[in-house]
Every structure is written in structure tokens, then in C-alpha cells.
Amino acid sequence: MIVNGKNYSEEIKKLLTQNSKNIDERFFGNNSFSLVSLCNGNIQGFSAYYKISNSLCEIFLYISPELIDQPEEIRLLEKLISVEKGNGFETLKVCVQNLSEHEKYVCKRKGFREETSSDTKNDLYKHI
């Protein structure tokens, strides 16, 4: 997967094979949300969850290493994805806060959400 001219295939493979203590296991396996709808059904191998903090909705993407580059379908994702490193864990992150209003609207229609003031600490991690 190429984002902003950089190939993230190796990072993605490391992410998928890494055993991280930082992520709640309920967000893996059959409980993972498929992002196929985000890509109009043309891409397989996405799963995600989001973390809400300080008015920022961070969407963490887990991408199958077998995923073939399909730039047209992931054009929106390419603008949003960044690599976050910390506490020995590396992940791909989408920051909804950094989107234009139009892109936020598109993302919301496809299942993303931003924090509301009613979100509580117990809701820090929510499954999409």
C-alpha cells in the first residue's frame, strides 16, 4: 500500500504479525468491522476500530498484507493515513479531525463518527 509516496507494505505486515498489549483483543478476529463498504466493496482485508479522545476520533486500520494496491478505491484513505509509533506499537491511523468538511461528511456516511460531549471515559474505545 502506497501512501504519500511511501510504501507501507512492510509496516502493515509488521502490524499484523505483532502481538500488542496495547490493544483490546475484542477488536480483533470476527468482531472486527469490515471497511469494504468504505471502498465500495472493491477491497477486502480491512478491519478497524476507533478511539475517542479530546474531540479526536482516531480510526485504526488493520490491512491484510495480501491486499493488492488499488489506488482509485483507496484515494480518500491515502489522504488520511499516517503511521503512529509509540510504546513499541506501530499502527496506521486516520485522523478525522484533519479532514475537510466534505470529507468528514463522506466519512460519516460511511460509518465514521466524531466525539460528542456525551462520550464518557468508559466509551474511550468503541467498535465501529
What do the predicted segments below correspond to?
Residues 36, 42-50, 57-58:
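Conserved beta-strand in the GNAT
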Residues 50-51, 116:
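Short, low-complexity Ser/Thr-rich regulatory SLiMs
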Residues 1-25:
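Short amphipathic alpha-helix that is part of the acyltransferase structural core
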Residues 98-116:
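Conserved active-site alpha-helix within GNAT-family acetyltransferase domains
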Residues 84-97:
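Conserved GNAT acetyl-CoA-binding A-motif
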Residues 110-111, 117-128:
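C-terminal "cap" of GNAT-fold acetyltransferases
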Residues 55-66:
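Conserved acetyl-CoA binding element of GNAT-fold acetyltransferases
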Residues 69-84, 109:
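Conserved acetyl-CoA-binding loop-helix of GNAT-fold acetyltransferases
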